[in-house]
Amino acid sequence: MRALFYKDGKLFTDNNFLNPVSDDNPAYEVLQHVKIPTHLTDVVVYEQTWEEALTRLIFVGSDSKGRRQYFYGKMHVQNRNAKRDRIFVRVYNVMKRINCFINKNIKKSSTDSNYQLAVFMLMETMFFIRFGKMKYLKENETVGLLTLKNKHIEISPDEIVIKFVGKDKVSHEFVVHKSNRLYKPLLKLTDDSSPEEFLFNKLSERKVYECIKQFGIRIKDLRTYGVNYTFLYNFWTNVKSISPLPSPKKLIALTIKQTAEVVGHTPSISKRAYMATTILEMVKDKNFLDVVSKTTFDEFLSIVVDHVKSSTDG
């Protein structure tokens, strides 16, 4: 698709706005159906018919902080939302197998690659940290789970603190208490004498991909699942602990904010890029709050999974 440059309702083929696009260009039909937010700058509209735009990227613009914002057609968004629902159910269905893998290999006396994979998977399923590709570390010093170094691990008698700067220069901090099952394996893996050495020094991107492949999911699926899982846990906790309860709308907004703080991005990104919309629609129901208040978290999670599964099957 050709990128066209937008200014004051007009389209141009150049970013100096010297060469206007003809009035019969199909992109003008697209503009009749969408509203480009006035606060966006450097807007690019993609040349396509309205029918094509329904399933594609329509336009991109920069917000006040210089971040590029992407706007897609309705059917693209619907397909993306349905995909998130399927990912949530798929990961939930393999979590027992993942935990079995962790339990089997984390008991090893050596710190071989399988042991490191077990610790890696345990950390990922606890904190849902971004993967951390080596190229991002080299390009902009962005750290993820795979690129954690010993210097990012602070050990004390009662807890271990994991501190690093991730994507978009967001600072992350995770606390592992001595009572947590991750404490001893992480302590065993950390080498204070080599601060610049990678924590997972026997792993590579390929080894992690091969490991996760056996479960029929992708590593990024764990983060999508994790955001929704964290949202559900926070939502369940809020229903149990807040009195009087705010409206469902305010309760959802509060829970999304809490979830975003845990996983390290803004509430809007949490909702737009990770949340399964079927889950959001489900928890909007006032009557559903009564169900939540009478269940354990595992029961609540099972109810949600069954509902999402029935929606995807339908």
From Swiss-Prot:
This protein's encoding gene: OPG111
Effect of R223 to E/G: Loss of activity
Occurrences of domain Topo IB-type catalytic (ranges): 77-314
Primary localization class, coarse: virion
A single MF term (Gene Ontology): DNA topoisomerase type I (single strand cut, ATP-independent) activity
Superkingdom, natural source: Viruses
Annotated keywords: DNA-binding, Isomerase, Late protein, Topoisomerase, Virion
InterPro entries: DNA_brk_join_enz, DNA_topo_I_N_sf, TopoI, TopoI_cat_a-hlx-sub_euk, TopoI_cat_euk, TopoI_N_vir, TopoIB_AS
Name the record gives this protein: DNA topoisomerase 1B
Family: Belongs to the type IB topoisomerase family.
Top EC group: isomerase
Effect upon mutating R223K: Reduced activity
Function comment: Releases the supercoiling and torsional tension of DNA introduced during the DNA replication and transcription by transiently cleaving and rejoining one strand of the DNA duplex. Introduces a single-strand break via transesterification at the specific target site 5'-[CT]CCTTp site in duplex DNA. The scissile phosphodiester is attacked by the catalytic tyrosine of the enzyme, resulting in the formation of a DNA-(3'-phosphotyrosyl)-enzyme intermediate and the expulsion of a 5'-OH DNA strand. The free DNA strand then undergoes passage around the unbroken strand thus removing DNA supercoils.
Gene Ontology cellular component terms for the protein in this record: virion component
Induction: Expressed in the late phase of the viral replicative cycle.
Active site (UniProt): Y274 (o-(3'-phospho-dna)-tyrosine intermediate)
Any coiled-coil regions, as ranges: none
Record's catalysed reaction(s): ATP-independent breakage of single-stranded DNA, followed by passage and rejoining
Enzyme Commission number, as recorded: 5.6.2.1
Compartment(s) of residence: Virion
GO biological process terms, semicolon-separated: DNA topological change
Impact after mutating T224 to G/P: Reduced activity
Annotated site, Involved in religation, chain positions: D168
